[in-house]
Amino acid sequence: MAHVVIMGAGLGGMPAAYEMRAKLGKAHRVTVVNSVDYFQFVPSNPWVAVGWRTREEVILQVAPLLERKGIGFIAKAVTQIDAEASKLVLADGQELPYDYLVIATGPKLSFEEIPGSGPHGGHTHSVCSVDHAQKFWADYQEFLKNPGPVVIGAMPLASCFGPAYEFAFILDADLRKRKMRNKVPMTFITSEPYIGHLGLGGVGDSKSMLESDMRNHDMKWITNAKTTKVEAGKMFVTQLDDLGNVLKDHEVPFKMAMMLPAFKGVDAVAAVPKLCNPRGFVLIDEHQRSKAYKNIFSAGVCVAIPPVEVTPVPTGAPKTGYMIETMVSAIVHN
């Protein structure tokens, strides 16, 4: 009897659990381990941030959903992966042996790389988790009483640019509904070499379409932007030219800011010898299998995918929902 353990209960971990359970016979066990007891639908976080959805509308309790399918669930953080011994060590010291491990943890949000950034002790917000979205909503309600400039965008080494654009237009729409948009200058600051690059070298006419829409919605932007630090009410940005030379230094004022951070691998995964690249992302082969450990597979944002192209300010390649689902299907069949 094989025991398959899945780390993570997000857009990768949950489909992995369901597909694995459906594919394997009842003689085999499937267990999901997650640091919290709920699933959050991350794509809805921008709506939570402006009050269009509540927390309760975008999360689900995991245990009953998995257990009725015969899938085990443990709501504890993993502190160590002992890949040689094929076991996990959980936050309470419990050891969980596995025959196969699927890593679908998502990323660690690397706010510490830019001094002064992040919602915990920093001066910027994020919509990468429902907790962060709720914090933006709480601060946004106070902001509406005395509005001012807003900055939205993505930090150097970010890879998930779509939600930054989405959030800019969501915030624009919400402010217009409130008849307050004219009181809120908006600046989009991104490490992309041009608007609509998206970490993909552009998608069709994304550059011209997004530039046009942003002009029509009175949004200014700074591209090739290397944000270096954030202070209360001020973002320090070095803008590079296409050759990587300094073009201009900006000090951008803001009253609220939502900047998507760079990602890294979570600590327990990044610490495993030979498993990951220097940023902690799992190195995999064409079968989604670890190059170092033949019984470890990985899917989602936590896998190592090279950038589509070299950019003056480093950018990463995004890993989207459908892409993650196909990774999961490959793991199950392999």
Predicted regions and their residues:
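Internal hydrophobic alpha-helix adjacent to the cofactor/substrate pocket in enzyme cavities
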Residues: 173, 321-334
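Short amphipathic alpha-helices and their capping/turn segments at secondary-structure boundaries
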Residues: 21-26, 90-95, 283-291
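Short amphipathic alpha-helical segments
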Residues: 17-20, 44-45, 113-116, 164-165, ...
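Beta1-alpha1 glycine-rich phosphate/pyrophosphate-binding loop at the start
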Residues: 2-72, 156-200
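A Rossmann-like FAD-binding core segment of flavoenzymes
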Residues: 27-31, 68-80, 96, 172-283
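FAD-binding core/adjacent interface of flavoenzyme oxidoreductases
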Residues: 1, 68-166, 170-179, 247, ...
